[in-house]
């Protein structure tokens, strides 16, 4: 078993997703837009499921995730504890079935902005469960099937728009030509379903709003130079955060791009995908990587 995948056992049957918001939680200062880079390559063992959690709520505090056969027996998962905005956990491997899941303020197991009473996970399937809306409207999670294709000698890419107040965006070449990711809106992914294939190699892309954004007008905030795309790998990039919090810094240079560590679900580090990630959002984007824990 890959040491990067955590096993949970003793959990039950099948069902649907039900969620409630409980307990008082204070909102934090809204965070700027970020691209969260995750490596999707790999597959669960037969009869198992993989699930990971993305903290994308721009004003929610750091959280711990509790999992059990039901909410009453849910226990903290060490590798899903202390998640802060813009972080995505490693995959957790579980038997197919239904799980009670609580998302609680870090260190406060009774202060839980989200309770998922019945999260159904199918066998031989990978999932990302994301919280993307502001805390006050965090009613339901976004659940995505990570339907990675078989390797074909190219890189597989998808972009997921999870910024609730950000308009549509396009990814363009330096000459202004489309690469096929245009008009991506919240809360959608591109492609849908599946992933786009890109030949391995070096790419030089920029990201622009699909329409003018006040007060800046035409906005192309990301232009990091040529980046490398690796063959045989699958990636997701999730756009999270608040455009309103980002626009005052829209003309600032983007932050440095950092690849995932060797404890991500897989260790490949295609920085290009962080560029493509920005197709899900606009305005002074800072790119971050998946968080890895032991």
Residue ranges and their predicted role:
Residues 2-12:
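Bacterial N-terminal signal peptides that target proteins for export
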Residues 2, 293-294:
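Short, intrinsically disordered, low-complexity terminal/loop segments
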Residues 3-4, 21, 123:
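Intrinsic low-complexity, intrinsically disordered segments enriched in polar/basic residues
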Residues 11-20:
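Bacterial N-terminal signal peptides
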Residues 25-293:
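Intrinsically disordered, low-complexity polar regions and short flexible loop motifs
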